Amino acid sequence: MSMSAIERVIPLVGHLPPSIREGLARRMRELAGLGLIALSGLASAALMTWSVQDASLSHATSRPIRNILGYAGAIGADLAMQILGLGAIMLVLTVAVWGWRMMTHRPFDREALRLGSWILCTVIAAGFVSCWPHGGAWPLPTGLGGVVGDALVRAPAVIFGPPGMIYRTVLGVILFAAMAATFLIACGLGAREHDDELAEIEDDDKPLDEDEESDRGSVSLGWLFHALMSTKARLIWLCGAAYRSLVSSGPKTRAVGFSRQEPNLGGGRAAPPISPRSEDEDYEEEHEEEEDEEEEEEPAARAPRKKAAPKAAAKKSSDKFELPSVSVLAAPKAGDRQPLSKAELEANSRALEGVLQDFGVRGEIVKANPGPVVTLYELEPAPGIKSSRVIGLADDIARSMSALSARVAVVPGRNAIGIELPNAHREKVYLRELLVAKETVDTVAKLPLCLGKTIGGDPVIIDLARTPHMLIAGTTGSGKSVAINTMILSLVYRLRPDQCRLIMVDPKMLELSVYDGIPHLLTPVVTDPKKAVVALKWAVREMEERYKNMAKLGVRNIDGYNTRLLELKAKGEEPTRTVHTGFDKETGKAIYEEEKLSLDPLPYIVIIVDEMADLMMVAGKDIEGAVQRLAQMARAAGLHVILATQRPSVDVITGTIKANFPTRIAFQVTSKIDSRTILGEMGAEQLLGQGDMLYMAGGGRISRVHGPFASDDEVEKVVRHLKTQGQPEYLEAVTAEEPTEDEDGGAVFDASGMGADGGGDLFQQAVAIVKRDRKASTSYIQRRLQIGYNRAASLMERMELEGIVGPANHAGKREILVEEEDSHM
């Protein structure tokens, strides 16, 4: 059935979109094929129940009719048997094959040739069966081929004489060959056509699963329902468009309750954006300008380091410190949000139902929840529909709905499956509207982070103090770096430097360098991977120091510690603690002194690492060990870690790191494997990028969030304001390692953190031990200096390079090349 024929039957089809018209044509063709198969089935039933005793045009009787189709079936079957005999079977069989070809979308061209071959095949079939004797069981006076068959057999007898057995056999073979040839032509089963149809058959059958092919009858009913629902959805859309055109001619008013534009998935054209440039272009160009400017700028001169405790930083100016104003941030524009009528949502829902029916998924869209970037359609599946089957159709749903991508997931706690489709008009999420939202203003979070908006447009505010650490992954351009910027701005907009300090590690030297010089920093932005290891080791020591102070006051976390300090300060008491300062040279006994504890509250410390992969390449074991200890123990001490990487592979996000970071954020990734690495399940590869993320809370619950955007200019304005509030009080010990101290964690941190020229005093001690004891082995140096094996091995390699010891022999022993009385350096 051609498209023009359908348009003549249904005038409304000409007004439908091309995708709907094409789908409707396919459904009508399938319905026609189903009708032909049903017609051939009825004809076969009439022929199978034919009886010569039934009433017909050539026989009158009062006996009841035994034909299954009644009087009409008896007359039709009798005519077919009288004229064609058993050759009528070929008449019905060819029609059934035509119906099968139409249902499976195989081509049916050259209709005149098909019909002519069909008639000729039926006549030849009647002659073929008339070649064989019927005996006495045949109730008709004619042969097995009826009147037509007898005429075809007896016609050559005029030339060759009365037909004998040999004549009938030869004629039967010839007629059989002719019947087979005409049958293949009538059915379109020729060799050339078969080869041409293979590709089309594969394309048509590809979206269907194996279990669906066995249920084409029930699926055909779904196709009919789809056609009806699509037509209904189009009518609703046309009525809505006419209504909007009338409303737009009058005074423009904003509809209450609608704040964002949704896609017209029914096939109509989406309204063009008001601004000449789309949000996606603004997002990409502003982010590229940020990277270009930071690459061209020379490293700014860093402020001189001052050795001061972190709790004393910005203490003098804390009372006068002024938090940044939200006025420097961009506000939402009036044209960014476009309402969507309920009629359009209803039309999209019905179109989605039709697509699901195409793939054999029965159910109903019970709710459409529009959001700033995507719309969530909740499908209530029919009994017996597996959720895994619907989830596996995500790519097919996106293709059928003409969407960039589609994400399908089960709605927790409900008998519903969520289908997330992107909006035609993407709304930009602004950081300003999140900072002034009621959820942010009224929050009691210690370290509030503005993550973005949910699918429904609600703000998402989390407390990093309760998280307590975060792992972020995403490819280039997915919005990972912008999300880190918005997290930093969320902290500096709410907390003063005496409440929260920051340690920023940026091996790429691009993303976080703009924050260099703000009062919240404990140290200048760390760009050297080796110094990053030292900074993480300092964080471990700071954590242990805080735990000792908490144990002295009998508290369990940093909030209790600060509260106890305020109570002691109000009472005028000065707490002390016992500190081991050394040993008596004469007696060898340990010396302890009483040290007063400061009454200044301890600030939170947030460690931000922008690119984890670069650090793992330089010092993987050091980083993994330090991050593990911080993630396991630092929560109560007020230290929190945010790790980000653009390469979420197993060699970067190791099992140890993953186990200690229950809170994770996945932006768009390139493959399902990367999504499983960061989240443990698929879905991140179907995100839209540019701030679209999947947020996994500590309990394993995953929700989709659309992150806010902060431009380069906004970040620079906030940084300039912070710099006017005071100079940063840097702590030199953060990046300056003290190698003379014995490290309990020596087995955790290897020698890569001290560098080629670091640890000079420790090296001198190792040389003195070798010259004095005349023993040179890694394990001996490790035991004497109480350090880790990696560091001891590094010291031995350096002594070999400087000619103090020789290379190890086959037994692992080294020759000492310096005399005992010699002094090195």
UniProtKB/Swiss-Prot annotation:
Superkingdom per UniProt: Bacteria
Gene Ontology biological-process entries: cell division; chromosome segregation
Transmembrane domains' residue ranges: 32-52, 79-99, 118-138, 146-166, 170-190
InterPro entries named in the record: AAA+_ATPase, FtsK/SpoIIIE/SftA, FtsK_4TM, FtsK_alpha, FtsK_dom, Ftsk_gamma, P-loop_NTPase, WH-like_DNA-bd_sf
Binding of ATP, residues: G477, S478, G479, K480, S481, V482
Keyword line: ATP-binding, Cell cycle, Cell division, Cell inner membrane, Cell membrane, Chromosome partition, DNA-binding, Membrane, Nucleotide-binding, Transmembrane, Transmembrane helix
Region Disordered, residue ranges: 254-318
Membrane topology: Multi-pass membrane protein
Key word Cell division present: yes
Domains (record comment): Consists of an N-terminal domain, which is sufficient for the localization to the septal ring and is required for cell division, followed by a linker domain, and a C-terminal domain, which forms the translocation motor involved in chromosome segregation. The C-terminal domain can be further subdivided into alpha, beta and gamma subdomains. The alpha and beta subdomains multimerise to produce a hexameric ring, contain the nucleotide binding motif and form the DNA pump.
Name this polypeptide is given: DNA translocase FtsK
Organism: Bradyrhizobium diazoefficiens (strain JCM 10833 / BCRC 13528 / IAM 13628 / NBRC 14792 / USDA 110)
Lineage of producing organism: Bacteria, Pseudomonadati, Pseudomonadota, Alphaproteobacteria, Hyphomicrobiales
Name of the gene this protein is made from: ftsK
